[in-house]
A protein has these predicted regions:
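Canonical Radical SAM [4Fe-4S] cluster-binding loop centered on the CxxxCxxC motif
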Residues: 40-87
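Short, intrinsically disordered, charge-biased short linear motifs at domain edges
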Residues: 47-52, 56, 60, 256-262, ...
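The −1 position to Zn-ligating cysteines in a subset of zinc-ribbon hairpins
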Residues: 56, 64, 68-71, 272, ...
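Flexible mid-to-C-terminal extensions adjoining Fe-S/redox cofactors in radical SAM and related proteins
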Residues: 1, 7-10, 20, 45, ...
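Flexible, glycine- and charge-enriched loops at secondary-structure boundaries
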Residues: 79-86, 110, 226-230
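Radical SAM/AdoMet-radical enzyme domain recognition
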Residues: 86-216
Length: 362
């Protein structure tokens, strides 16, 4: 199904295809409905909500994440909290019907291990929301894969370089599911990424490899951060531009790098940090933040006290947005990258002398 929504508050339209996941936005529309070519800064409601249904992680407790070189930003090896209740999830979904396109199910653990996983997927579809999620694959079964085929738009498997990783990918592919690989790109993994892209060495049949930039949050260390002046970063983005038998994508945290190093990627296809502009994160504890990497809870708002729309328009979220609004005023590429990550400026792949990081409002 395809649909178009008119955001009357910010004067633009967006379209979404529930089958393919295709998503497009117009520019700001003038009084005659003509596209001005100016990108709208934000929507009146998040178009994608990262719903952290998991409060604890079976996979993380085994230590296998750390063994694979992944520093869990949610500290899944250390923190144990209750999973999100079905009633809380339904409350989120019912508010989002007709306003939000997708729910990215996540949190501190594998969403497919939630005790009410099937019911959660059904609630999504009942409210015209497409559920997607990322899994370690550790607990994947043919029965879970069948549920994914029935309800999900796509499933991503985290690249843990383990037998269960490959088994989960194969299980999902055999079930006919659009399957992606999520690959955390850090100092300890970029050489492998370049090598695998050079040799097209990812499982046959996958839809895409999505590269997620390592951040120093939770168990993630600063030592594993990449720097813009590391020559391997330029080599990596050169491979991103090369044709492969699978699609290559990236999270918005990597967009400044694509702007800096890529020459053949259409700027219109890039969307920089959408936190607080087109997306947000809601944890199992019903705390809402512009981005799930706000592990210091600088911008959190409790949904026990207000609706999602109220939280979206809160002072905390506005403080987050103002960091992007005030970034890099003298740079001609400001509208494309908005200064990059407002939470961790140190991860941004930019070496421009026009770079300016707006100080956080108190």
């Amino acid at each position: 199904m395809r649909y178009v929504v008119h955001d009357k508050k910010y004067h633009f339209k967006f379209a979404f295809d529930t089958e393919t996941g295709a998503y497009v936005r117009t520019g700001i529309l003038d009084e005659n409905g003509k596209d001005t070519g100016v990108d709208p800064f934000m929507g009146s409601y998040p178009h994608l909500i990262d719903v952290g249904i998991m409060g604890h992680c079976i996979h993380g407790k085994t230590g296998l994440c750390a063994k694979a070189g992944i520093g869990c930003y949610q500290s899944g090896m250390l923190v144990e909290q209750p999973n999100m209740s079905v009633d809380d999830f339904r409350w989120i979904a019912e508010q989002s019907k007709g306003r939000c396109n997708q729910f990215a199910l996540g949190g501190r653990g594998d969403p497919d291990q939630h005790e009410h996983f099937e019911e959660i997927l059904k609630i999504c579809r009942k409210n015209n929301l497409v559920p997607n999620f990322t899994t370690s694959g550790y607990g994947m079964t043919p029965e879970i894969a069948a549920l994914c085929k029935k309800y999900c738009g796509a499933v991503a498997v985290s690249w843990y370089r383990s037998e269960y990783t490959l088994q989960a990918i194969q299980m999902l592919l055999e079930a006919g599911i659009k399957t992606n690989i999520h690959y955390v790109l850090g100092n300890n993994s970029i050489d492998e990424a370049i090598d695998r892209l050079t040799r097209n060495d990812f499982p046959k049949g996958i839809n895409a490899v999505i590269f997620l930039l390592h951040k120093p949050a939770g168990q993630g260390t600063r030592a594993n951060m990449l720097s813009v002046d590391d020559p391997r970063v330029a080599q990596f983005f050169a491979q991103v531009e090369t044709r492969h038998p699978f699609k290559v994508g990236m999270d918005s945290c990597n967009v400044p790098g694509a702007i800096r190093f890529c020459t053949s990627i259409l700027p219109e296809s890039l969307d920089t940090c959408e936190g607080g502009r087109y997306s947000c994160y809601i944890g199992a504890d019903m705390m809402m933040v512009p981005c799930s990497f706000d592990q210091k809870k600088r911008y959190e708002v409790s949904l026990r006290d207000m609706t999602i729309e109220d939280a979206w328009n809160s002072e905390a979220f506005e403080r987050f947005r103002n960091r992007m609004r005030g970034a890099c005023p003298g740079c001609e590429k400001k509208e494309l990258c908005m200064g990059g990550c407002p939470l961790m400026p140190e991860i941004v792949f930019c070496d421009s002398d026009k770079r300016y990081v707006k100080e956080e409002e108190k």
